[in-house]
């Protein structure tokens, strides 16, 4: 039986973190991305107790090669794009 592999773009946000928890609870292998996985503390993933169960990677969605690279590495069966700036103020400052 083929294992379900999920890739979540925007895993550090509220929706991405809760989706990751749901998928883990349902037997998925979960991978997540952030613009800079080295510097992000993923506080909500820690709070939910799932950070250590997820493989985290740095990906810049505006860089085609970065996206293709992660897709080729992980070969996900499902992809979720929950990335984006949720702060209205910051969305004008950093579109």
What are these regions (language model features)?
Residues 1-95:
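N-terminal Rossmann-like NAD(P)+-binding domain of SDR-like oxidoreductases, especially those catalyzing
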